[in-house]
């Protein structure tokens, strides 16, 4: 390499909407640079988690260091940091981008620009990254590179005249991408301080090594034996080993400025290396941490309970291990009258929640019940205190509430023009208020303010169905807004089931209560006694349905004879049912808890 060790380093990310071929392009780049031999290559090398492969999405940021001999004859050190594309994982993207000097914006030439690419691209531009547009899937008959270029310029506003057109699947023109990386993405710049500063891009737990952190060294160097200080926690740890992924784990003597690699430092506590934090030397610390570290705020909350109460300690341990990989996952113990001990968990969105539940069940072999997800509400009490409420069961009594505020988000929806009407209708049904509509070439951008509670459940699915799958959605939190909200409780035989309580808009309360009762009637198995299902607001019952009892025909052995004999047997049966109803408990199946989700918010 040249005299300046950082001159030939290129740190870059790949940003794209879900399904535009980001992971496939990463595979081709690894193959071309000889990161893996042909026999070791497999599809989606960087998506190491089986759920990522099955769903075809990237959840966690991954990195790989490659050597590339460019056409100018020099050897370049390329560090690729893969990023997720789904709206739920936008913080993962911003951290990955903070570790780079450039980004490849991958756009499917047959589909054009979609909302998530726009959001991630704006993040990259705000952080001062050089964005190189890549048009992928040019081998498809429906690919239209000129239209895709025009959309990139119209929607995102960056110059696409030198966009590189490739087919990641076949490997066509991928070498031009590598040349564009070398020529257009700047080398890392030395910082004004000589002291060590390293950004933690990701952390995960390894049973043998403890916590492994993926870091970008901004300044200084990390060597085994040095004492590292984690700036947000104030704790220091001795470094065991450092290295890079090629994508196999490779140990090095040191990590120097500009490089991206892994560090192990015997950190056993899963909260010891928060993602987005800064590492520095304990005996010669940097004056201030790197900018941009923020605590991620969960937006969707749900209860997770083990089906078997004995699994509670295992669930706690599994959640603690998952939280290390997942900076956004929050949980606290919760006790439900209906389901015993479990945890109240906070997630970024519905996809995040599904993935966490799937990982718990798969990787830790747990059998779980999930309650219906809710968003966080603000409650202003009559004594002037403001409380955050993430669980409807914790809502204060009505006479203590001054007002309830719900979270409002701003959503940007990109859709083909023919579906604009359907999108507007859907947003209006969800109590949205329109901000504006912008026509951008072959796409229309519809901006709405929507209540988050309406979006988290099934908005995305409905948006896809009314636009035949063409629309894409990106959203961010705006503010809390007051509204007329009530809690609808579900009573089973007069007992309130706290896990089935929901907070709804007053105008929808009666319909939601009625639909919930009907749904529960189909899902609760018949007992030996009548089961009354009621929906109530406070003490006022707004709906009721009954699961009829199974009964034995006690008159089967009476042939003719006196009517009083039959009456006596029927009375005896009635008494037994009454007694049974007093002591009998109704087992509520998992499907009943998810019924709250399935009620169509028409």
Curated annotation (Swiss-Prot):
<dbReference type="GO" id="GO:0003924">
    <property type="term" value="F:GTPase activity"/>
</dbReference>
<dbReference type="InterPro" id="IPR027417">
    <property type="entry name" value="P-loop_NTPase"/>
</dbReference>
<keyword id="KW-1003">Cell membrane</keyword>
<dbReference type="InterPro" id="IPR038363">
    <property type="entry name" value="LepA_C_sf"/>
</dbReference>
<keyword id="KW-0342">GTP-binding</keyword>
<feature type="domain" description="tr-type G">
    <location>
        <begin position="7"/>
        <end position="189"/>
    </location>
</feature>
<keyword id="KW-0472">Membrane</keyword>
<dbReference type="InterPro" id="IPR006297">
    <property type="entry name" value="EF-4"/>
</dbReference>
<dbReference type="InterPro" id="IPR009000">
    <property type="entry name" value="Transl_B-barrel_sf"/>
</dbReference>
<keyword id="KW-0997">Cell inner membrane</keyword>
<dbReference type="InterPro" id="IPR004161">
    <property type="entry name" value="EFTu-like_2"/>
</dbReference>
<dbReference type="Pfam" id="PF00679">
    <property type="entry name" value="EFG_C"/>
</dbReference>
<dbReference type="Pfam" id="PF06421">
    <property type="entry name" value="LepA_C"/>
</dbReference>
<dbReference type="GO" id="GO:0005525">
    <property type="term" value="F:GTP binding"/>
</dbReference>
<dbReference type="GO" id="GO:0097216">
    <property type="term" value="F:guanosine tetraphosphate binding"/>
</dbReference>
<dbReference type="Pfam" id="PF00009">
    <property type="entry name" value="GTP_EFTU"/>
</dbReference>
<dbReference type="GO" id="GO:0045727">
    <property type="term" value="P:positive regulation of translation"/>
</dbReference>
<protein>
    <recommendedName>
        <fullName>Elongation factor 4</fullName>
        <ecNumber>3.6.5.n1</ecNumber>
    </recommendedName>
</protein>
<feature type="binding site">
    <location>
        <begin position="19"/>
        <end position="24"/>
    </location>
    <ligand>
        <name>GTP</name>
    </ligand>
</feature>
<feature type="binding site">
    <location>
        <begin position="136"/>
        <end position="139"/>
    </location>
    <ligand>
        <name>GTP</name>
    </ligand>
</feature>
<dbReference type="InterPro" id="IPR035647">
    <property type="entry name" value="EFG_III/V"/>
</dbReference>
<keyword id="KW-0547">Nucleotide-binding</keyword>
<dbReference type="InterPro" id="IPR005225">
    <property type="entry name" value="Small_GTP-bd"/>
</dbReference>
<dbReference type="InterPro" id="IPR013842">
    <property type="entry name" value="LepA_CTD"/>
</dbReference>
<comment type="function">
    <text>Required for accurate and efficient protein synthesis under certain stress conditions. May act as a fidelity factor of the translation reaction, by catalyzing a one-codon backward translocation of tRNAs on improperly translocated ribosomes. Back-translocation proceeds from a post-translocation (POST) complex to a pre-translocation (PRE) complex, thus giving elongation factor G a second chance to translocate the tRNAs correctly. Binds to ribosomes in a GTP-dependent manner.</text>
</comment>
<dbReference type="GO" id="GO:0043022">
    <property type="term" value="F:ribosome binding"/>
</dbReference>
<dbReference type="GO" id="GO:0003746">
    <property type="term" value="F:translation elongation factor activity"/>
</dbReference>
<dbReference type="GO" id="GO:0005886">
    <property type="term" value="C:plasma membrane"/>
</dbReference>
<dbReference type="InterPro" id="IPR000640">
    <property type="entry name" value="EFG_V-like"/>
</dbReference>
<dbReference type="InterPro" id="IPR035654">
    <property type="entry name" value="LepA_IV"/>
</dbReference>
<dbReference type="Pfam" id="PF03144">
    <property type="entry name" value="GTP_EFTU_D2"/>
</dbReference>
<comment type="similarity">
    <text>Belongs to the TRAFAC class translation factor GTPase superfamily. Classic translation factor GTPase family. LepA subfamily.</text>
</comment>
<keyword id="KW-0648">Protein biosynthesis</keyword>
<dbReference type="InterPro" id="IPR000795">
    <property type="entry name" value="T_Tr_GTP-bd_dom"/>
</dbReference>
<keyword id="KW-0378">Hydrolase</keyword>
<dbReference type="InterPro" id="IPR031157">
    <property type="entry name" value="G_TR_CS"/>
</dbReference>
């Amino acid at each position: 390499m040249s005299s300046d060790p950082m001159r030939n380093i290129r740190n870059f990310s790949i940003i794209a909407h879900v399904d535009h071929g980001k992971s496939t392009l990463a595979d081709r780049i690894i193959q071309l640079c000889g990161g893996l031999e042909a026999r070791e290559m497999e599809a989606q090398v960087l998506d190491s988690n089986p759920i990522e492969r099955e769903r075809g999405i990237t959840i966690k940021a991954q990195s790989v260091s490659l050597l590339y001999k460019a056409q100018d004859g020099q050897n370049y050190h390329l560090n690729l940091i893969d990023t997720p594309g789904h709206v739920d994982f936008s913080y993962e993207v911003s951290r990955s981008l903070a570790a780079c000097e450039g980004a490849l914006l991958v756009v499917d030439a047959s589909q054009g620009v979609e909302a998530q690419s726009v959001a991630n691209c704006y993040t990259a531009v705000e952080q001062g990254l050089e964005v190189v547009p890549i048009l992928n899937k040019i081998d498809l008959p429906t690919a239209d590179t000129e239209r895709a270029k025009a959309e990139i310029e119209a929607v995102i506003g960056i110059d696409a005249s030198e966009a590189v057109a490739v087919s990641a699947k076949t490997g066509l023109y991928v070498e031009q991408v590598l040349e564009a990386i070398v020529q257009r993405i700047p080398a890392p710049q030395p910082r004004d301080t000589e002291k060590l500063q390293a950004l933690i891009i990701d952390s995960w737990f390894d049973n043998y090594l403890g916590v492994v952190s993926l870091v970008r060294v901004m300044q200084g160097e990390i060597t085994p034996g040095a004492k590292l200080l984690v700036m947000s926690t104030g704790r220091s740890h001795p470094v065991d080993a450092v290295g890079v992924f090629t994508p196999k784990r490779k140990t090095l003597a040191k990590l120097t400025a500009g490089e991206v690699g892994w560090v192990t430092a015997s950190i056993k506590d899963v909260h010891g290396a928060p993602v987005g934090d800064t590492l520095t030397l304990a005996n010669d610390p940097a004056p201030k941490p790197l900018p941009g570290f923020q605590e991620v705020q969960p937006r969707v909350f749900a209860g997770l309970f083990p089906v078997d109460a004995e699994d509670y300690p295992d669930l706690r341990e599994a959640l603690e291990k998952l939280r290390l990989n997942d900076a956004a996952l929050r949980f606290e113990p919760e006790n439900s009258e209906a389901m015993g001990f479990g945890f109240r968990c906070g997630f970024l969105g519905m996809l995040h929640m599904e993935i966490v539940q799937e990982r718990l069940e798969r990787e830790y072999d747990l059998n779980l019940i999930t309650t219906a997800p809710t968003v966080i509400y603000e409650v202003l009490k009559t004594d002037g205190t403001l409380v955050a409420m993430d669980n409807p069961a914790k809502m204060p009594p009505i006479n203590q509430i001054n007002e309830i505020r719900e979270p409002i988000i701003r959503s940007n929806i990109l859709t083909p023009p023919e579906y604009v009407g359907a999108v507007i209708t859907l947003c209006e049904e969800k109590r949205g208020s329109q901000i504006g509509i912008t026509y951008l070439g072959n796409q229309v951008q519809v901006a709405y303010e929507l209540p988050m509670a309406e979006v988290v459940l099934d908005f995305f699915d409905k948006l896809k169905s009314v636009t035949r799958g063409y629309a894409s959605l990106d959203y961010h939190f705006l503010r809390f807004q007051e509204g007329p909200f009530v809690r609808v409780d579900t009573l089973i035989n007069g007992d309130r089931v706290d896990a089935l309580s929901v907070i709804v808009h007053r105008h929808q309360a009666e319909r939601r209560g009625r639909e919930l009762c009907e749904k529960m009637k189909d899902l609760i198995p018949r007992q030996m006694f009548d089961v009354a299902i009621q929906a109530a607001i406070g003490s006022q019952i707004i709906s009721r349905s009954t699961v009829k009892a199974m009964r034995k025909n006690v008159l089967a052995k009476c042939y003719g004879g006196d009517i009083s004999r039959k009456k006596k047997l029927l009375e005896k049966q009635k008494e037994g049912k009454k007694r049974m109803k007093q002591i009998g408990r109704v087992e509520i199946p998992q499907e009943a808890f998810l019924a709250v989700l399935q009620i169509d918010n028409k």
